[in-house]
Structure formats: C-alpha cells, structure tokens
Amino acid sequence: MHRIAVPAATGAPTAQEPVKVAARNLDFYYDKYHALKSINIEIPEKRVTALIGPSGCGKSTLLRIFNRIYALYPKMEARGEVLLDNENILSPKYPMNRLRSKVGMVFQKPVPFPMTIFENVAYGIRHHEKLSKADMQNRVEQALRQGALWDEVKDKLGQSALGLSGGQQQRLCIARAVALRPDVLLLDEPTSALDPISTSRIEQLVEELKRDYTIVIVTHNMQQAARVSDYTAFMYLGDLIEHDRTETIFSQPSKQQTEDYITGRFG
C-alpha cells in the first residue's frame, strides 16, 4: 500500500491548541442543492490546515464560507455558525468590512489588479485605514517582504503588476492579502496554475507565514498537503469524513474512506 511521506508531527493535538475558527453544525445550500452537511471543525491558531478531497466534495465551498464571499451571489445560504474568535461571522450583525480585514483570501488563479505593483498592495489598505505616505510605503514594503517578493520588485514598484510572472503574481496576491494584517489567510489551490519552482516557493512561503497567520489551504495535491500542513481534513460529498493531524491522516487514518482516498483507490 502506498503511503505519502509526511514530516514528524509538531505541537499539541487540536484540542490543546487555541482555536481560531470553528464551524458548528454548518450546512450550506446552492439554491436547493445541499452542498455541505452538518460540518463541525475547529481550525487551530497559527497552524496550517489543509482541506483535501475529490472535486465537488465541498472543500472550496467551506473555504468561501469562512469569509462569506458566497454572499456576493444569489440563492446561496449558510446555516449554523462559523466562529472567528468566538464571534459568529454568519450573523447579519457581523460587519463585512471587519470580516474582510480579518480574513484574507488568495485564489487558484493569480488575479493582480490592472495597476502598479505598489497600488496592488496599497489598494486594500486605503479602503480600511488612513496612513501617511511614509507609513503606506513602509506597510507596502512589509507586505511585499512577507510575500517573499520585495527583492524582486523593489526597483519597479511603479510598473504594472500584469508584467510579473505567474509565480510572482501569486506572491503579489499573497502580499496584498497580508497587507491588511488579517488573522486568517485562506488559500484556494494557490499553486495549481504554477510551475514546480514557483510551487516550491509558495510552499516555503506558507511555512513562513504560519508564524503570524492561521492558514487554511485547499489542495488537490496530497503530497502538498503532507508537506505544508499541520492538520488535514478529508471531505467527501459534502461531509467532513475525518480531521486530524496531517501525520495521522496520511499514516494511520481512522476511516476507511480516508484511507481509500489517500491511497488512490478513488478520487
């Protein structure tokens, strides 16, 4: 039986770590289609949690609920609770601007804005804070450093972001997300459109970013989940089948469905 090699586990089990995000009895509907079914999961603070499962299992849907991006589209409904620092972000009383500043998101395909590299990073900050020119410059530099991009673009901040390579554009999107200093960073298959070298750089970056951020990453690449995550959740047909330490999921899963998936018997 083929097993994916994983690093040795570090830190304490989920139950002993501070919980940053928690879904409680979460159901989600696309019109009448029941996409997520009574999901209960706790995301530990300043750890990387990977969501894995076959296409259509609900992992990207769950990710989008964590920042309520689904609310931009009609006929979508979430029921239950998603707690961020023990506050229910699904409540109509939870301010959307506050949520956007606390939960950043990076998508599968890099989406730089058609503006300069500097303005790409400054854009979100301007909508949430009023900074002096010097403070803005410092903030943009800090974000680009966190995105591991500063050394490559520091002399061309006034150039269009559209001229960057795909890997650079994705790191710019990460820098743009962390520029607001969120608590949580959501990554939806952030390397699926990138070459192996760019993928490796993003994975290294994820490892660095978890010192400051709680990270949830959706990936179809189980080797990637094994490399970058501390915890892994396996989803199938809208159900959360198993959630545990990554080392446990890939070496001693408790559910047969999980074992069948990670050993390539389906999916």
Curated annotation (Swiss-Prot):
EC supergroup of this enzyme: translocase
GO function term, MF aspect, one: ATPase-coupled phosphate ion transmembrane transporter activity
Main location (coarse class): membrane
Localization of this protein: Cell inner membrane
Keyword tags: ATP-binding, Cell inner membrane, Cell membrane, Membrane, Nucleotide-binding, Phosphate transport, Translocase, Transport
Domain ABC transporter: from-to ranges: 21-262
EC number: 7.3.2.1
InterPro entries given in the database record: AAA+_ATPase, ABC_transporter-like_ATP-bd, ABC_transporter-like_CS, P-loop_NTPase, PstB-like
Membrane topology category: Peripheral membrane protein
PROSITE patterns linked: ABC_TRANSPORTER_1, ABC_TRANSPORTER_2, PSTB
A Pfam cross-reference name: ABC_tran
Family: Belongs to the ABC transporter superfamily. Phosphate importer (TC 3.A.1.7) family.
Protein name per its UniProtKB record: Phosphate import ATP-binding protein PstB
Source organism of this protein record: Xanthomonas euvesicatoria pv. vesicatoria (strain 85-10)
Gene: pstB
